[in-house]
């Protein structure tokens, strides 16, 4: 049967208080553990889509508590837990919904990995996601990795780059958004000035190793940049959205993540 939203008490009148109540009690009337939903997935999926709509107006704390309620009940059954984790992947992580939230998705990943009911093979995908979700987040130190220059054998490490700021630009010359971003970064006079003054290193990285296609495109990048490739970039970075821009400071601490040229220029200007 379709789920029924909780009745919000009439005494709660302001939108924020009503949304807090709604998200706190969202799963009260929903039969989360019902195995019939495994063959009627559209019902829990629609319930989850509506839940993400309320997430947008509810507080972070209330949202995470409500997710915890859902997972505690779902965790009693391996198939039910995996169904909700898959739905959450679709609407919170893979970008098929109107809200992407790694913070809200991470509890689903942890629940699957912590479950004694789920076998190792079915955990593999979530184990990989956990690695990506817990690396290279805002405020963290950038995970060190090796890169190499076009046609050269010698490998370099990011931690050895000496500059007040490093702009890590992960991109693929075959992707249209990447081509546009490359153009915008290359015509930025303020970035060029920072590079020439030694305050900024722009490290453009192709994440899939030194391919012939990539080698054929390296001439398109500005000569002031460090243009390089790395192996297995998807083990270090979340590459669902390309290009990816990270601004790190002299200690390789991430101060901007999945950012824009405007944000980078603003931070560099503020830190003159």
Give names to the regions the model predicted.
Residues 162-165, 197-200, 242-243, 251:
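Active-site lining segments that contact anionic ligands and/or coordinate catalytic metals
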Residues 40-43, 172-173, 208, 251:
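Solvent-exposed coil/turn segments that connect beta secondary-structure elements
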Residues 180-219, 232-235:
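Structural microenvironment flanking redox-active thiols in thiol-disulfide oxidoreductases
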Residues 215-251:
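Short, internal strand/loop/helix patches
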Residues 1-154:
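Oxidative protein folding and maturation machinery
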Residues 156-186, 201-205:
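Short active-site neighborhood of thiol/selenol oxidoreductases, capturing the structured segment around
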């Amino acid at each position: 049967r379709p789920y029924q939203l909780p009745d919000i008490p009439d005494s709660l009148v302001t939108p924020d208080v009503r949304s807090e109540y709604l998200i706190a009690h969202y799963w009260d009337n929903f039969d989360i553990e019902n195995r019939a939903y495994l063959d009627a997935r559209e019902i829990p999926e629609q319930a989850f889509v509506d839940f993400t709509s309320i997430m947008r107006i509810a507080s972070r704390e209330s949202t995470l508590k409500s997710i915890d309620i859902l997972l505690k009940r779902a965790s009693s059954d391996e198939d039910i837990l995996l169904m909700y984790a898959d739905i959450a992947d679709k609407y919170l992580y893979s970008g098929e919904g109107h809200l992407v939230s790694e913070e809200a998705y991470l509890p689903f990943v942890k629940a699957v990995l912590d479950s004694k009911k789920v076998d190792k093979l079915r955990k593999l995908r979530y184990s990989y996601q956990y690695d990506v979700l817990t690396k290279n987040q805002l405020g963290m130190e950038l995970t060190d990795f090796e890169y190499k220059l076009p046609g050269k054998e010698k490998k370099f490490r990011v931690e050895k780059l000496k500059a007040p700021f490093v702009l890590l630009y992960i991109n693929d010359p075959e992707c249209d958004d990447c081509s546009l971003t490359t153009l915008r970064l290359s015509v930025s006079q303020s970035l060029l000035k920072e590079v020439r003054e030694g305050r900024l290193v722009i490290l453009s990285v192709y994440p899939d190793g030194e391919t012939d296609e990539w080698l054929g495109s390296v001439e398109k990048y500005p000569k002031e940049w460090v243009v390089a490739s790395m192996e297995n970039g998807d083990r270090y970075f979340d590459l669902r959205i390309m290009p990816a821009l990270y601004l790190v400071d002299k200690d390789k601490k991430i101060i901007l993540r999945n950012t824009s040229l405007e944000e980078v220029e603003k931070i560099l200007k503020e830190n003159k």
